[in-house]
Amino acid sequence: DPPFAPRM
């Protein structure tokens, strides 16, 4: 996952 899209 990219650092600007945190997983929920």
From Swiss-Prot:
It is found in: Secreted. This is Pyrokinin-3. The keyword tRNA processing does not apply. The lineage of its organism: Eukaryota, Metazoa, Ecdysozoa, Arthropoda, Hexapoda. One of its GO terms (biological process) is neuropeptide signaling pathway. One of its GO terms (cellular component) is extracellular region. The modification Methionine amide is found at M8. Myoactive.
